[in-house]
Structures are given as structure tokens and as C-alpha cells.
């Protein structure tokens, strides 16, 4: 399909710069293709009532790391330049791949000293520069010591459409982190997860809905635009994920009992679909996935998806169109824009039913 088929105009004021407070007050658009009504305006607080006893809620327990680092490169003679690096992929115990700005001012072998706003520094040497724009850094620390240093001096990697309008602050340390985050490794939040609170999770459990975790580390590629004119020419970025044998067995048991698989976010959806067989059985999975889901894809495992409202021409809006049908997706997004829904990472959500 042509990528411009997934384009739409979004007024700038529809982009959320902060999450709803309280979280459960965020709006929720229920989308049921072929039902009457097809579109139903609710709130996140209504979610327990929209699920059924016996359903399984699948959440991504990845944890966002403060992956944006500010530093200085100094050359012999004293010339300096400010460097901003966003870590995107761990290469070893002491090395990371990153996007750096301005990368053209860095040379292999040079040292960058990253510093935190409240003190502390971290040195890194430029190992390599790739044509893709990646810069590989070897840090002076390794393992848990490196992790602690990054946590101390790093900034939360807010999406470009938020960072362009306001600076990151202390609130983002909690606002941009899901309540069930556990496994460090993401450089962007699985944003549908941001709507959950302990109280909401307790109400969902009381409804008779079980909860299972998978892990998919969200990479910076989630923000990269689709440059191809046709979806068949786009290469999806790869992200690391895991579905444990125990979780796979439990989800298969839920399906065997007639329960629905409710995937929270595009990350959990893509991982579960990667792990599923054509017959719908979910297998244990460990490794990278670059699954690219577009209209025409036959879903194997996910029955219902909770997700935010996404960017025009993005792979995420293509996933939504695949889930409920392209025409339904267009109607849902037009309704959301006209009705004042808030878009993107800190915005409102939709509950998609197939």
C-alpha cells in the first residue's frame, strides 16, 4: 500500500505534552468494527468494565532508561563542541550504539565527557561511525557501574514531538515510566502502558482478568519516519523481546478456555504475533523481531489491543489499520481529532476489538 494512504492532518494542539491527571481520566475510544455503535467514547477508568472475566491482559514490563546524555568533545588545542547522544542499543558490557548530534563533529578515537546537571561525569571513546548515522561508544565503566552512571547523569528520552516543545524535567522520570516496568532496556516508553495505575490494575484483577508480562525493549527506531513511498519497500527496525515458556503456556491455556488475549500496546502486540504460529498457538520466544504489520495481515493471537493515537504515516498507525481495517481506522482517527482526543505518547488511548 502507498504510505500516503496513512497520512492525516493533526492540529498541533492535539499533541499531549503531559499525561492526564489522574491517569484513569484519560479518554478511551472503543472501536468495534461492524458493531453499533462502531465508535464509543469512554475513559481509561471504564477499562475493567470493557474486559471480560477469563480474559488475559498482556503487558510489556520493559523499563525506560534515561538514555539521552549531554556531553562535550574536546580536541588538542582546546576546541570543544557540545554533543548530545541518545543510546539506542547495548553492544557489550561497556559499549553502546547511539544517535549523536552533531555526529559529523566526532571522529573515531575521540573522547566525549558526558555530565549530569547535578554533577558526575562519564567518559566514552568513539569506537565507530556507521553510514546509518549510528555512533558506537566505549564507556570507561562497564556492567552495573555503567548502568548506575547512566541513571545518574542521563535524561529521559522524550519523543521529538514533546522535546521540541518543552524540556525534560523530574516529572518525566515517573510520568514516562510504566508502573509495571521491571527489565531495563528501552529508550522509549511502551506508551499504552502509561495509563495504568496500581488501583486500575487491582480493579482489572477483581474483574477476573489475569495479567501476564512479556518483554520487548523499545528502540529509537520507533520514532524514525517511513521514508518509502510504498509499505513493501520499508524495512522495519528490529527490537529484542522475550516471551517466557511459562507465559506462552498460560496464554495458550487462556485461549483454550475461550478467553481473549488483550495486548497492551503495539510492542506487546508485535511480540505476541511474532511468537504465534499460523494456527494461533503462542510459542516461547527469545530474540529480535522486525515484524511489520500492515492491512491484510492475519492476526494469530491478539484479540483486543489497547494503544495510543499515533503519528501520521507511521508503522504504528498502519498496525492499527491492520487490526480494525483501514476504513475503520480512518473513521476512528477523524472522530478522535474532531472530538478533542489527545495524541501520541502522553495522550489518550483507543481499545481496538476485532
Curated annotation (Swiss-Prot):
Its main location: cytoplasm. Its EC number is 2.4.99.17. Pfam families: Queuosine_synth (PF02547). One of its GO terms (cellular component) is cytoplasm. InterPro entries: QueA, QueA_dom1, QueA_dom2, QueA_sf. It catalyses: 7-aminomethyl-7-carbaguanosine(34) in tRNA + S-adenosyl-L-methionine = epoxyqueuosine(34) in tRNA + adenine + L-methionine + 2 H(+). The keyword Transferase applies. Keywords: Cytoplasm, Queuosine biosynthesis, S-adenosyl-L-methionine, Transferase. One of its GO terms (biological process) is queuosine biosynthetic process. One of its GO terms (molecular function) is S-adenosylmethionine:tRNA ribosyltransferase-isomerase activity. Pathway: tRNA modification; tRNA-queuosine biosynthesis. It is found in: Cytoplasm. Monomer. Transfers and isomerizes the ribose moiety from AdoMet to the 7-aminomethyl group of 7-deazaguanine (preQ1-tRNA) to give epoxyqueuosine (oQ-tRNA). Belongs to the QueA family. This is S-adenosylmethionine:tRNA ribosyltransferase-isomerase. The gene is queA.
